[in-house]
Amino acid sequence: MQTKLFYFFVLLSFIPGFFLVQQEQFVALSIWIILITLFSLWYDWKFCLLNLTIVGFFIAFCYFVPAVKINQIVKNNFIRTPFINWIDQTTKGELNQYLKLFLINETTKNNLYQNALKLNIVHLFVISGFHLSFLFNLMERFLWKRWYLNKLSGFAVLLIYLFLVGFAFSALRVFISTLLKQVFKKQLPEDNLSLTALLIILISNHALNNFGFNFSFLACFVLLFVNKLKLLKALKPLVSSSLILIVISPLSLYLNSRLNAFSVLFNLLFSPIALFYFCVSWIILPFIGVFGQASFGIYLPLKMLSEWSLKVTVFLQIPKPNLIFFFVYYGLLGLLYTIFTVAYYDNNLWSRYWANSPKIKSNQKQFSI
């Protein structure tokens, strides 16, 4: 049994069940359980039994256990709160907004964040897994490797950052995923995204109701998918941006009720810019007391670019999607991903469970006769 596919299928089976239980659609839930049972049995009875057991546990856990929202419980902690107070005392106005956005994921009353939301590129301007992975990889590569000091330092920085951003799900994803990779290097596949999602749901059982959680994991699924495709290196950013737009557009529509026709181009344009300002914000932080509000000058090009982008873009007004649309849309995407994964990434699995199945072999013999 392929663990990567198994965790993905468990997650794919659980998510509709979670929302059906929330809506108290128990008849639809029963039909869904029958469907995933039949599909699992077609694959393997052990797979079916294990999948149903885990999915049933997660649905019961989310239904009976009171809602735990870890990102709200620990948002004001002993690291984040003093840091915010220091920024508020040292800066004001737009400089205060921009520093909070790039350093600690604070989006309240932030003009740049609102512009990014309208442009459908909001995932680039919050502290994402990409930023933290970049930070950990930087420390792992360049710090002293003896006694695993580089990895220990990397985890220490990730943990501090986790408190700084108030346990945002995108940061929690990187921390758990990186920890799993380092501790269970041989036992788990390298991209343990589905397992990480299930563990976060165990920590915060209503994580699926959080848009940050959904944006982070959906975008990451797309990036992992594209990285394994045999494409020209120059084409990968374009393909990634296009697929991310396709995958997260229902969430963007739900928040904004319109789509940016130039989203793909703006994703390509703003991706390196967002990473640049993430790094620059930390570099200028020690000098804020010296230069004061003049430090905002470094953010002026970004502000002007975001405002210009709003003026030149074309918006498509589309009705806000409902729950049924989400089920159908992401159900089809999940099914296509599963089929493509089996057929493209693992030919042995495809051959073992389909091409070499008794039914197919018997049809081949009849055809040859």
From Swiss-Prot:
Disulphide bond pairs: none
Keyword list, A-Z: Cell membrane, Membrane, Transmembrane, Transmembrane helix
Principal location listed in the UniProt entry: membrane
Example of a GO cellular component annotation carried by this entry: plasma membrane
Residue intervals passing through the bilayer: 25-45, 47-67, 119-139, 152-172, 206-226, 235-255, 272-292, 296-316, 323-343
UniProt family annotation: To B.subtilis ComEC.
Stated name of the protein: Uncharacterized protein MG316
Biological source species: Mycoplasma genitalium (strain ATCC 33530 / DSM 19775 / NCTC 10195 / G37)
